[in-house]
Curated annotation (Swiss-Prot):
It is an enzyme of class 2 (transferase). The gene is aroA. GO terms for cellular component: cytoplasm. It comes from Bordetella avium (strain 197N). Pathway: Metabolic intermediate biosynthesis; chorismate biosynthesis; chorismate from D-erythrose 4-phosphate and phosphoenolpyruvate: step 6/7. This is 3-phosphoshikimate 1-carboxyvinyltransferase. The lineage of its organism: Bacteria, Pseudomonadati, Pseudomonadota, Betaproteobacteria, Burkholderiales. One of its GO terms (biological process) is chorismate biosynthetic process. Its EC number is 2.5.1.19.
């Protein structure tokens, strides 16, 4: 798949079947870092095998952490509490879930580190996190444009027990500080409080972070979404083993197939017991008119097939809490019974690409009437006669490729450019897709 320049999708009419989800990217990289900083050995099962987890695994090994591949999505991590390597140059691709948390953790290590990534990573802002870490006493220098990677992290003088961070650009900045805080609290014996400035976006991702920290014995005292305190002497202790649940953001594409293609499509790996906020996308689908059923670790979706004249209900919704899954809603809007609007999606602009611009561009190619602003996008679906054949650019963004696979339910010919970009989170996506759909 990685070698293909493009993939022509056949026109599809139906989708049904069962699909096991790959491991959650958000959980996988958080667990890998926590396990590396914990006392004891952790066996991790269900780990996502993708570009983003590979760069995290490579970075941890460079930092001296012993990681053993046990096969079949299982690894063993020997916790080091502090990274043995005091000097390293790390290449972290376009993995925000690796770059941001490692920046915070390394800032507290007292070593000499350089962090870089692909060109797009060097366009993704990190200034709010760096400002917070500098105020904490860290020494961090920009190696290019101020406010953006690459970074040089040196030996700082961590003294403050209260840190403030902006919450309006990316919740990963708060996650990074939370994951790193036990390093300092455990070393100093003093509690560390992290204050959030402004409105915190993507709150469900913070819930994932707090849940995983608790599994490793660090319970965070909260003052709503404004302040988070890690007690003095806090330290991560391995639970011995931990299972990574399926990726709820990835589930959105497969569930959407079930809705648009009649279904049912059932995904396994997430369900009523999931800790991921993107499972709420099932409620979004229900509001569109889909039939949704759930179990402890599965979700099933069906609907009225659009190839038979079915249409989803038009929507005007705030997607602040589920920005990744919201991309699926944007392409589903091609099959709505009226104009649709996605609000509060400003975080799209600093993701793997400027997703508002990319979505606007590619949806318009198919014949939709699209408008967008700083944090919103609206779409009027094309009439059947207005659909246009399109070569869909994926903008080196895995989610663009997966979202636009849904366009094959329409009457136009769809070509996905650079389909291999799905390797960031779901290398086998188009194989799984082919197993669910039919003409």
């Amino acid at each position: 798949m990685n070698a293909l320049a493009y993939l022509d999708l056949p026109h599809i009419r139906q989708a049904r079947g069962l699909a096991a989800l790959p491991g959650s990217k958000s959980i996988s990289n958080r667990v890998l870092l926590i396990a590396a900083l914990a006392e004891g050995r952790t066996e991790i099962s269900g780990l996502l095998d993708s570009d983003d987890t590979r760069v995290m695994l490579a970075a941890l090994r460079q930092l001296g952490v012993a990681v053993t591949d046990l096969g079949q999505g299982r690894v063993a991590v020997e916790g080091a509490r502090r990274f043995p390597a005091e000097k390293a140059e790390l290449f972290l691709g376009n993995a925000g879930t690796a770059f941001r948390p490692l920046t915070a953790a390394l800032a507290l290590m007292g070593g000499d580190y350089r962090l870089s990534g692909v060109p797009r990573m060097h366009e993704r802002p990190i200034g709010d996190l760096v400002d917070a870490l500098r105020a904490w006493g860290a020494r961090i220098d920009y190696l290019g444009q101020a406010g953006y990677p690459p970074l040089h992290i040196g030996r700082g003088d961590i003294r403050a027990d209260r840190v403030r961070v902006q919450g309006s650009v990316s919740s990963q900045f708060l996650t990074a500080l939370l994951l790193a805080a036990p390093i300092e609290a455990g070393a100093s014996g003093r509690p560390v409080t992290i204050e959030v400035i402004g409105e915190l976006i993507s709150k469900p991702y913070i819930e994932i972070t707090l849940n995983l920290m608790a599994r490793y014995g660090v319970n965070v005292v909260r003052d709503g979404w404004r302040a988070f305190t890690i007690e003095g002497d806090a330290r991560y202790r391995s639970p011995g083993s931990i299972a990574v649940e399926g990726d709820a953001s990835t589930a959105s594409y497969l569930l959407a197939l079930g809705v648009l293609g009649g279904g049912p499509v059932r995904v396994t790996g997430v369900g009523e017991q999931s800790i991921q906020g993107d499972t709420a996308f099932a409620d979004t689908l229900a509001a569109m008119g889909a039939n949704i059923t759930k179990g402890s670790d599965w979700i099933e979706a069906s609907g009225q097939a659009v190839a038979e004249g079915g249409r989803i209900k038009a929507f005007d919704a705030d997607f602040n809490l589920i920005p990744d899954a919201a991309m699926t809603a944007a392409t589903m809007a091609l099959f709505a019974d009226g104009p649709c609007r996605l609000r509060n999606i400003g975080s799209w602009r600093v993701k793997e690409t400027d997703r508002i611009h990319a979505m606007h561009t590619e949806l318009a190619k198919l014949g939709a009437k699209v408008e967008s602003g700083p944090d919103w996008l609206s779409l009027t679906p094309p009439a059947d006669s207005d659909w246009r054949d399109a070569h869909i650019g994926t903008w080196d963004d895995h989610r663009m490729a997966m979202c636009f696979s849904l366009a094959a339910f329409g009457p136009a010919a769809v070509r996905i450019l650079d389909p291999g970009c799905v390797s960031k989170t779901f290398p086998d996506y188009f194989d799984v897709y082919a197993g669910l759909v039919s003409a």
